[in-house]
């Protein structure tokens, strides 16, 4: 009886392993079928990876709470509010930030709440907090990235943050935040940092993951150079949102870009639309000899080289490069990155 039980258990294990092997083989066949039929979407893979890496921090507070309340809660030690928070809407935003309002309004602006904190017993020493509710994290990242100051230094405060001598700038959830002091001093620098940390720690937000960011290789990409254009990138109105980043290739700095195109015709149709647009502006299409990138288009815009191509539903390219060979090399790097990711995800099967 004991021997029979052992034999039965051994047989059960063998059957289980055999079943797993069959299921694995069926999965490989299914992926291959999707690839052949054009049904595999590399972006769904990246989206899944991003979802796995994103976490929600447990908290009793939320960045969805009243902006005025948030400002009151981030008061640093040794400082006090100089009054009540000011609130600005679409109609009054330009009263506070004259000359810069259009960018915010185009990126989903909801409201701005501002509050000045003054040093106790020394009201001439102060800093002001600008809390922009942009409605969604991608909108907050867009305004953060597009107007990032060239003299800014990347900060470890938050994933997307930087500092200048008298200020700190960062995005957090749906908010884009600026904290600007009246002068440069250690006291104000410490107060601003404390206030920013109070906001981040007391009002945690869901981790921000931008799909387009994962579609561009990190290798040779300059940290903090990314910019998100929600519309009209490079003056082309038909573009969906476009992410750009600066790369160093062959000792040259160049701008790469990526856009996910889900409309009629997808990325392939967008490549043709953009080609026609550039030629309409006076661009000259140049023949590309022996490119490793299928369907690559190169347009000479009076010395500025525009290179672009599509892979799946993504349009990728190099914008306004001065060195043709370096631009072609970077385009090949972009294409290789996407195809390598695809092959890795499908067990070596080609795109």
Regions found by a protein language model. Give the residues of each.
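N-terminal "mature-domain start" segment
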Residues: 9-126, 154, 176, 183-253, ...
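Short, well-ordered beta-strand elements
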Residues: 128-129, 174-182, 255-258, 313-321
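Long, charged/polar, surface-exposed segments that mediate recognition or autoinhibition
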Residues: 134-150, 154-155, 193-204, 260-282, ...
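Juxtamembrane low-complexity tails/linkers enriched in Ser/Thr-Pro and polybasic
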Residues: 1-11
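A cross-kingdom feature marking solvent-exposed beta-strand/loop segments within repeated
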Residues: 142-168, 178-179, 183-186, 278-305
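Short, solvent-exposed coil/turn segments at beta-strand boundaries
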Residues: 78, 170-176, 252, 292-294, ...
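Short, surface-exposed beta-strand/loop micro-motifs that present aromatic residues
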Residues: 112-119, 164-171, 241-249, 297-298, ...
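C-terminal soluble interaction/assembly domains
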Residues: 260-349
């Amino acid at each position: 009886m004991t021997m029979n039980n052992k034999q039965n258990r051994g047989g059960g294990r063998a059957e289980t392993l055999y079943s797993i092997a069959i299921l694995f083989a069926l999965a490989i066949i299914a992926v291959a079928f999707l690839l052949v039929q054009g049904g595999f979407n590399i972006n769904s893979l990246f989206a899944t990876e991003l979802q796995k890496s994103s976490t929600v921090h447990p908290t009793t507070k939320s960045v969805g709470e009243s902006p005025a309340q948030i400002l009151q809660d981030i008061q640093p030690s040794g400082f006090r509010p100089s009054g009540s928070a000011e609130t600005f809407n679409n109609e009054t935003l330009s009263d506070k930030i004259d000359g810069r309002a259009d960018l915010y309004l185009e990126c989903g602006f909801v409201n701005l709440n501002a509050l000045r904190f003054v040093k106790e017993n020394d009201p001439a020493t102060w800093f002001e907090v600008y809390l922009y509710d942009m409605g969604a994290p991608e909108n907050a990242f867009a305004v953060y990235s597009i107007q990032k100051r060239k003299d800014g230094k990347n900060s470890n405060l938050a994933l997307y943050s930087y500092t200048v001598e008298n200020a700190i700038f960062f995005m957090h959830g749906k908010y884009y935040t600026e904290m600007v002091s009246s002068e440069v001093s250690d006291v104000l620098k410490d107060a601003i940092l404390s206030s920013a940390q109070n906001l981040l720690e007391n009002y945690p937000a869901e981790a921000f993951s931008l799909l387009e960011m994962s579609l561009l290789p990190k290798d040779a990409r300059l940290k903090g150079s990314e910019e998100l254009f929600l519309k009209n990138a490079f003056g082309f109105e038909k573009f969906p949102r476009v992410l750009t980043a600066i790369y160093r290739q062959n000792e040259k700095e160049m701008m790469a870009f990526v856009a996910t195109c889900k409309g009629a015709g997808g990325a392939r149709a967008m490549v043709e639309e953009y080609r026609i647009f550039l030629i309409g502006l006076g661009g000259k299409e140049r023949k590309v000899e022996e490119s490793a990138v299928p369907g690559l288009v190169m347009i000479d815009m009076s010395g500025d080289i525009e290179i672009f191509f599509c892979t799946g539903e993504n349009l990728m390219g190099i914008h306004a490069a001065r060195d043709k060979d370096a631009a072609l090399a970077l385009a090949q790097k972009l294409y290789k990155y996407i195809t390598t990711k695809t092959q890795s995800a499908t067990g070596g099967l080609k795109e």
